[in-house]
């Protein structure tokens, strides 16, 4: 059985508000909206994680890794090395169901 499946309902695919994407299970910080970009795959795509330990990786084949939450192990999707929007950047394809979005709160001056 493939780690990657598509059942539709990728609510974050075309979602580009400012904020942060966290693990849907434990709330650990995974991706910033600044690293999100449009891609032809059916899943939300990111170029980098927030923290070095945001995800754990298991090599699936050369240049492709299964990624899980670095804190709780929740299955997130895949990283494709050097397949991002610019040379040298990765493409993280992540299941919307594995993410929770936290909008950026504008600071109010008092």
Curated annotation (Swiss-Prot):
Q: What does the record give as the reaction this protein catalyses? A: L-methionyl-[protein] + [thioredoxin]-disulfide + H2O = L-methionyl-(R)-S-oxide-[protein] + [thioredoxin]-dithiol; [thioredoxin]-disulfide + L-methionine + H2O = L-methionine (R)-S-oxide + [thioredoxin]-dithiol
Q: What's its job?
A: Methionine-sulfoxide reductase that specifically reduces methionine (R)-sulfoxide back to methionine. While in many cases, methionine oxidation is the result of random oxidation following oxidative stress, methionine oxidation is also a post-translational modification that takes place on specific residue. Acts as a regulator of actin assembly by reducing methionine (R)-sulfoxide mediated by MICALs (mical1, mical2 or mical3) on actin, thereby promoting filament repolymerization. Plays a role in innate immunity by reducing oxidized actin, leading to actin repolymerization in macrophages.
- What is the name listed in the Swiss-Prot or TrEMBL entry for this protein? Methionine-R-sulfoxide reductase B1-A
The note on cofactor binding and number reads: Binds 1 zinc ion per subunit.
Database matches in Pfam families: SelR
Q: Which PROSITE patterns has this protein been placed in?
A: MSRB
Localized where? Cytoplasm; Nucleus; Cytoplasm, Cytoskeleton
């Amino acid at each position: 059985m493939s780690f990657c499946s598509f059942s539709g309902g990728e609510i974050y695919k075309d979602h580009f508000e400012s904020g942060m994407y966290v693990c849907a299970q434990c709330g650990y910080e995974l991706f910033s909206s600044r690293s999100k970009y449009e891609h032809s795959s059916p899943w939300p795509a990111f170029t980098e994680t927030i923290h070095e330990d945001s995800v754990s990786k298991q090599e699936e084949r050369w240049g492709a890794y299964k990624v899980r939450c670095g804190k709780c192990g929740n299955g997130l999707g895949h990283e494709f090395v050097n397949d991002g929007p610019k040379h040298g950047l990765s493409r993280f394809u992540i299941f919307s169901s594995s993410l929770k979005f936290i909008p950026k709160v504008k600071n109010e001056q008092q």
